[in-house]
Amino acid sequence: MDTPGMDKWDETFNKHEIIQEFPEENGIKKIIEYLFIKFPLMMDNRDIVQEKKIWKEYNGNKNCFLTISKSIEHPSHPPQKKVVRAEMVISGMFLYENSPGETSIYMVNNVDLKIKSDFVNKIAKKSPKDFLENLTKYCKKMSK
């Protein structure tokens, strides 16, 4: 699984764009990405510009995948009118292959979408489940 291919399986975002990629250094790949989320009518859409670091192996273990992300500003994607700039306070995902065909996934997300807590609570229950279902479908498709 590679983050630049996220748009093939992650339906959370309506747009996923790699703004900048840096050469891999000490086993860490760094990218700057732009994410756009379309919201229901009567609500402004949201976007995020974030820096993501990706380890395809962790502590010498080749059966691990780790990402850590946080919001940043980038001159190529300044805030837009009628789009609220959400803040990715911190996000992380750790995947570990326990055995062939069995993987553990740990996720931490602290995102400020700058909306009322009622709506956040509603989507907070649904989003991680949808994310994992989409990831699982994609992994099964790729393993065939």
Which residues does each predicted region cover?
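Eukaryotic helix-grip
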Residues: 1-144
